[in-house]
Amino acid sequence: MEISYYEILEITQNADKETIKKAYRKMALKYHPDRNQGDKEAEDKFKLVNEAYEVLSNDEKRAIYDRYGKDALKGGGFGSNSSGFGGFEDLGDIFSSFFGESFGSSSRRRKSSNDEKIPSDFIFNLKLSFKEAVFGCKKNIDFTYKCSCKTCNGTGAKDGKLQTCPKCQGRGQVGVSQGFITFAQTCPDCQGSGEKASEKCNDCKGLGYNESKDSVELNIPEGVDTGMKLRVNAKGNILKNNTRGDMYVKIIAAEDDTFIRDDDDIYIEFPVFFTQAILGQSIKVPTIRGEVTLNLPKGAKDGQRFVLEKEGVKDVHSSRIGNQIVQISIKFPTSLNDEQKELLEKLSESFGIKDGMHQEQKGLFEKIANWFKS
């Protein structure tokens, strides 16, 4: 079932214009591309929010929508505002009206020609084995960084000369239409700067930067995990003013076939023979640091968990050490020789199991029989 424009803006069907405007402001701010870069779902929702506002803020379109639905609006031709911005003069005005100077008009949003084409910092993904992440290690890594082009002063233009971008006319934004809705998007030709090279720099091929290689030895601390970042000072990109940013090393730790890691705790499922569980024997259990002894209680149950304190991972920020949790899985023999079968039959009889039924099972059947009689 298609969601209605009122549901998109989270308002009722009798909402007045002020309520619609406030709802649009809230939803547009939530899903705006500038706040959700790279999020395709947020981008799609932002388009729907704009589409809903375009219709509900226009009395004629809203009346048609309320009576006939969205299909009646296809093809355009409704209302006097053909720009698609709900009565605002340009792409930037709709955002400055709702969000203030932080979004500003299209002319204020335009990037300066002095802006850097590259960020000062960047992220380097480093893959580690399970053991390397748990215990720490030394790693020599080779990486590529960007350096602002000296020839064109980072502009990407020959001799550093730029002209007004013909696609966006210097605004830094262009209008993109979807159906009868038009919304603002960063100009793909000038990346929002409003300026473009008439002729590309021969040195950097119009990119505004060149790439160089570097290497560094890293001391990976004990206890790092996937998603953690280590900052390496002054190993980032080099900007126009010759300052160098930082490199952030993002850890990607591999999983292990035996041990399961959850922050600083280690989990392991360990097989236990049924006689060991019944008798409560001592067993040897592997940990990340070697074998330890686990004393099973008599009658240990399948799936029962036991905590081995301080047998987990050392916390990367402190001296605390996690635990290892051992979950036992009770195993039964799948085949028996004659001697084993005879022994088990005798054991079964010694527990009072006759006619294929244990005393507790008989008691349960008797209870059920009495339930039917009552």
Swiss-Prot record:
GO terms for molecular function: ATP binding; heat shock protein binding; unfolded protein binding; zinc ion binding. Belongs to the DnaJ family. The lineage of its organism: Bacteria, Pseudomonadati, Campylobacterota, Epsilonproteobacteria, Campylobacterales. Participates actively in the response to hyperosmotic and heat shock by preventing the aggregation of stress-denatured proteins and by disaggregating proteins, also in an autonomous, DnaK-independent fashion. Unfolded proteins bind initially to DnaJ; upon interaction with the DnaJ-bound protein, DnaK hydrolyzes its bound ATP, resulting in the formation of a stable complex. GrpE releases ADP from DnaK; ATP binding to DnaK triggers the release of the substrate protein, thus completing the reaction cycle. InterPro entries: DnaJ, DnaJ_C, DnaJ_domain, DnaJ_domain_CS, HSP40/DnaJ_pept-bd, HSP_DnaJ_Cys-rich_dom, HSP_DnaJ_Cys-rich_dom_sf, J_dom_sf. This is Chaperone protein DnaJ. Homodimer. Keywords: Chaperone, Cytoplasm, DNA replication, Metal-binding, Repeat, Stress response, Zinc, Zinc-finger. Binds 2 Zn(2+) ions per monomer. Its main location: cytoplasm. Zn(2+) 1 binds at residues 149, 152, 201, 204. One of its GO terms (biological process) is chaperone cofactor-dependent protein refolding. CXXCXGXG motif repeats lie at residues 149-156, 165-172, 187-194, 201-208. Its cofactor is Zn(2+). A zinc finger (CR-type) spans 136-213. PROSITE patterns: DNAJ_1 (PS00636), DNAJ_2 (PS50076), ZF_CR (PS51188).
